[in-house]
UniProtKB/Swiss-Prot annotation:
Start and end residues, zinc fingers (C4-type): 254-281, 740-766
Keyword Repeat listed: yes
Entry's family note: Belongs to the ABC transporter superfamily. UvrA family.
Location of the ABC transporter domain: 311-588, 608-937
Protein's name according to its UniProt entry: UvrABC system protein A
Highest classification ranks of the organism: Bacteria, Pseudomonadati, Pseudomonadota, Gammaproteobacteria, Lysobacterales
Length: 965
């Protein structure tokens, strides 16, 4: 087998005819500026060709079920293995996918519970075990030999009637004593039972003291009792009838209520199968309901003024119902909703129950008619309309009032009652899936089951333990197996897939990874790199697109692509060992690694103003432990902490949702908190995350940033366009008029090829230009609208520098390092980091008031050291304008330049959720329990770290505020 992957003439996207040789079975890191062509080489060339060749080796029938990659633009490639790509893209948007199901650990857990689980009665908690007569006798012989006992057979359980026939049958069979409702009687003197009351009748089969010499007698007595009691029997002391009886069953059922289960099988524990799913929520764990908080959109207004949309004066039909209600219950329809009595509000929302109300209806002729009936209620009315309508538009409108809540039937466990009551070592399956992965691993390490159960469990437990161990190795010990897949970050999803691949144990495969260190704290980096080297040591080629310094330093072979981004990139600046990269004169990466170039620490940090702070008190969502957060206004604040410590819950789920609802008038669900103070300092809140800017190829940077509108208006002002009467709409590829109708403005036509990949061919009418010939005849400075969309941001800025409305938006795209993007580049081709920076540029182009609260979640994703330097300049510029910038970040270069750092921890999951320290980076670096501080100290001058706890009189306060320790 060849020892090299040979690539010749790679021209995918912006790659400039690259020729290179990569060593196989090594850890290769591809680095370079954002947009320089790293992903084009790793994913769109090497992975695409490896995958394509493997799939093409399959039969034509099999190929039609697989997505075949497009053939990359290159001359030759040799030495490829079958390729597996592990990307950042979110794992699944399916609400049924969880960490357990993705990793297949849940499948092993289902098998474990089906084979060795101990079912119990949900009501009486007795194990469902079919006992033999010998087992029953052996159990009785362990009882106190000094006590007297009686053996009972239940004949009637909790049934109404006098039961005279039962007593006659028992008498005829030779029984002399019975126990009725807990009282012992001779069978001839049983009192007459009350006809309409429930009674329990048990026949006394035997009375004894437990001794070895009565073993045979006991066995015969038990056989009689089981026959009479339909497989049930009980033993009770004769001296004190208040003690709990010993219950026995020869059937697989509860000895008290006869509850039974069919044989356990893995399907019973699957929330995706009808056999195991909770019937109330169909295995989703949540139910939808019309939320009164969303129905009453303006509680400060009156019903007549629009407290409930659609039920005010403007809607005559529904308002006449409210008017009749007001008359019946004597409340004022002009009083605010908040001031109405609770019972009145409940009646309006949920109906009048059985109470009949006189309603006055207006007829079409203008008259009035009276009718008496119950009031349905606003919420039941919405539910009925949602259920009965066949209109998608009506459903979409009504869905605005719907919220989700934990299923009241299963408590969010997704499983039905039977599956929730099967135990392994006194734990149910839902109890295991809510444990953090490191605790679950500990449970399985110490799990010892007796007898045959232990023998069966040993192999299953080994598989579960290994897979849990892999998740811990990639830094995901804080996750739980029941965590929904659609709540995972890109980095978490990628590392889960990485753990699954290690579990597969394949050899001779080529793995291509996209920034696996995203969202990972420096502390966990070592474990991740250990995982990558383990994959390599198995005999695989591991190709990683990465910017993390530790990963670059640990690579066997480094490839630096550049020198710039977009059209300025696509070349190999340097390749080889770490030393070769550091010595290469053209390598920007080498300059940062060698220390010749670095991101500087600010000479002076902006001090916080104690009188201008945003105070959030008692935040306790997910794993937060009543956190009290203080954010200084007008500063650049970093939120740090190990993965799973609660950063996203505190900032995204609590602070942002709260501020957006209060300031922007949004209606996000807010994680629980006690109080908030200081929101009046801000007039706008902006959250810039990494979700895509558009999910269709028609969305692009020009449309998203709002630049396309002034661009179309500019073309409509060209003399030729005015002469023809063209409006700005003529230059849109989304509406009829100016677009090419053959391809409906796509520029491409999809040709389905079945077992080959779908081919997109340029439209043969417009030749891929999206517009019709007449529209393309309109030119501005010699360029038509298609030429402009094909331009890079950099080139477009030169063309439109005299048009402020367009130039301002282009300048901000350049500021955030996106000068290489084409204006019309499809949004679906942008990486998460690029999408986030497009959003940032959109916000930057708006006129800010200096009172905006910006929240960014890991903005350095996908960024090279050089890009980070440019991003920091933008963030500091926002701060200098008086705005408040909050960044959730692991990157130490960003943290060291912050004015204020708030570090959460100390660990992830249940062992996190507290603020360890809040202060300057120097203060955090000096904190003994902060993992962030430990790594940060290495980047800060030693004197700062040692002196951070001391200050001269009058010096600004920058010492750490230590909380919860």
């Amino acid at each position: 087998m060849t020892a090299l992957i040979r690539i010749r003439g790679a021209r995918t996207h912006n790659l400039k005819n690259l020729d290179l040789d990569l060593p196989r079975n090594t850890l290769i890191v591809i680095t370079g500026l954002s947009g320089s062509g790293k992903s084009s080489l790793a994913f769109d060339t090497i992975y695409a060709e490896g995958q394509r060749r493997y799939v093409e080796s399959l039969s034509a029938y099999a190929r039609q079920f697989l997505s075949v990659m497009e053939k990359p633009d290159l001359d030759q490639i040799e030495g490829l293995s079958p390729a597996i790509s592990i990307e950042q893209k979110s794992t699944s948007h399916n609400p049924r996918s969880t960490v357990g199901t993705i990793t297949e650990i849940y499948d092993y857990l289902r098998l474990l519970y089906a084979r060795v689980g101990q079912p119990r009665c949900p009501d009486h908690h007795y194990p469902l075990e079919a006992q033999t007569v010998s087992q029953m006798v052996d159990h009785v012989l362990t009882l106190d030999p000094e006590q007297r006992y009686m053996l009972l057979a239940p004949v009637v359980r909790e049934r109404k009637g006098e039961h005279t026939q039962v007593f006659e049958q028992l008498r005829a069979q030779g029984f002399v004593r019975v126990r009725v409702d807990g009282e012992l009687y001779e069978i001839d003197v049983v009192p007459t039972l009350t006809l309409r009351q429930k009674h329990t009748i048990e026949a006394v089969i035997d009375r004894f003291r437990p001794r070895e010499d009565i073993k045979q007698r006991l066995a015969e007595s038990f056989e009689t009792a089981l026959k009479l009691g339909n497989g049930m029997a009980s033993v009770q002391t004769l001296d004190t009838t208040t003690t709990t009886p010993h219950l026995f069953s020869s059937k697989y059922s509860c000895p008290v209520c006869d509850y039974s289960l069919p044989e356990l099988e893995p399907r019973l524990f699957s929330f995706n199968a009808p056999m195991g799913a909770c019937p109330a929520c169909n295995g989703l764990g949540v139910t939808e309901f019309f939320d009164p908080a969303k129905v009453v959109i303006h509680p400060d207004l009156s019903l007549s003024a629009g407290a409930v949309r659609g039920w005010d004066r403007r809607n005559a039909y529904y308002f006449q119902l409210i008017a009749s209600l007001a008359k019946h219950y004597t409340f004022d329809i002009d009083a605010s909703w908040e001031s109405l009595p609770e019972e009145i509000r409940h009646t309006i929302l949920f109906g009048s129950g059985d109470e009949q109300i006189n309603f006055i209806y207006l007829t079409e002729a203008g008259g009035r008619t009276k009718r008496k009936h119950r009031f349905e209620g606003i919420v039941p009315n919405l539910e009925r309309r949602y259920r009965e309508t066949e209109s998608a538009a009506v459903r979409e409108e009504l869905a605005k009032y719907v919220s989700t809540r934990t299923c009241p039937e299963c408590g969010g466990t997704r499983l039905n009652r039977a599956a929730r009551n099967v135990f392994v070592a006194d734990r149910t399956l839902p109890e295991l899936t809510v444990l953090p992965i490191n605790d679950a691993l500990e449970f399985f390490k110490t799990l010892r089951l007796p007898g045959w159960r232990g023998e069966i469990a040993i192999k299953i437990v080994k598989e579960i333990g290994e897979r849990l161990g892999f998740l811990v190795d990639v830094g995901l010990d804080y996750l739980t197996l029941e965590r929904k897949a659609d709540t995972l970050s890109g980095g978490e999803a990628q590392r889960i897939r990485l753990a699954s691949q290690i579990g597969a144990g394949l050899v001779g495969v080529m793995y291509v990874l996209d920034e696996p260190s995203i969202g990972l704290h420096q502390r966990d980096n070592e474990r991740l790199l250990g995982t990558l080297t383990r994959l390599r040591d198995l005999g695989n080629t591991v190709i990683v697109v990465e910017h993390d310094e530790d990963a670059i330093r640990q690579a066997d072979h480094i490839l630096d692509i550049g020198p710039g981004a977009g059209v300025h990139g696509g070349e190999i600046c340097a390749q080889g060992s770490l030393e070769q990269i550091m010595a290469a004169p053209r390598s920007l990466t080498g300059q940062y690694l060698s220390g010749r170039r670095r991101i500087e620490i600010p000479k002076q940090r902006h001090p916080p103003n104690a009188t201008k702070m945003l105070h959030l008190r008692g935040a306790c969502g997910n794993n937060l432990k009543g956190v009290n957060l203080d954010i200084p206004e007008g500063l650049f604040t970093c939120i740090t902490g190990v993965s799973g410590s609660g950063k996203s819950t505190l900032i995204n789920d609590t602070l942002f949702t709260l501020a957006a609802n209060e300031i922007n008038g949004a209606s996000h669900p807010i994680a629980p908190y006690a109080s908030v103070d200081g929101l009046e300092l801000f007039d706008k809140v902006v959250d810039i995350d990494q979700s895509p800017i558009g999910r269709t190829p028609r969305s692009n940077p020009a449309t998203y940033t709002g630049m396309f509108t002034p661009l179309r208006e500019l073309f409509a002002q060209v003399p030729e366009a005015r002469a023809r009467g063209y409006s700005p709409g003529r230059f849109s590829f989304n509406v009829r008029g100016g677009r090419c109708e053959a391809c409906e403005g796509d520029g491409l036509i999809k040709v389905e090829m079945h077992f080959l990949p779908d081919v997109y061919v340029p439209c043969d009418v417009c030749h891929g230009k999206r517009y019709n010939r007449e529209t393309l005849e309109i030119r501005y400075k010699g360029y038509n609208i298609n030429d402009v969309l094909e331009m890079t941001v950099e080139d477009a800025l030169k063309l439109f520098e005299a048009v402020p409305a367009i130039a301002r938006k282009l300048e901000t795209l350049v500021d955030v390092g996106l000068s290489y993007l084409k204006l019309g580049q499809s949004a679906t081709t942008l990486s998460g980091g690029e999408a986030q920076r497009v959003k940032l540029s959109k916000e930057l182009s708006r006129r800010d008031t200096g009172r905006t609260l910006y929240i960014l979640d890991e903005p350095t994703t996908g960024l090279h050291f050089y890009d980070i330097e440019a991003l920091l300049a933008v963030l500091h510029k926002l701060r200098d304008a008086g705005n408040t910038v909050i960044v959730i970040e692991h990157n130490l270069d960003v943290i060291k330049t912050a004015d204020w750092v708030i570090d959460l921890g100390p660990e992830g999951g249940g062992r996190g959720g507290e603020i360890l320290v809040a202060g300057t980076p120097e203060a955090v670096a000096a904190h003994p329990h902060s993992h962030t501080g430990h790594f940060l100290a290495k980047l800060l001058p030693p004197k700062d770290v040692s002196n951070c706890g001391h200050r001269d009189p009058g010096e600004e306060v920058d010492i750490a505020q230590t909380v919860h320790r």
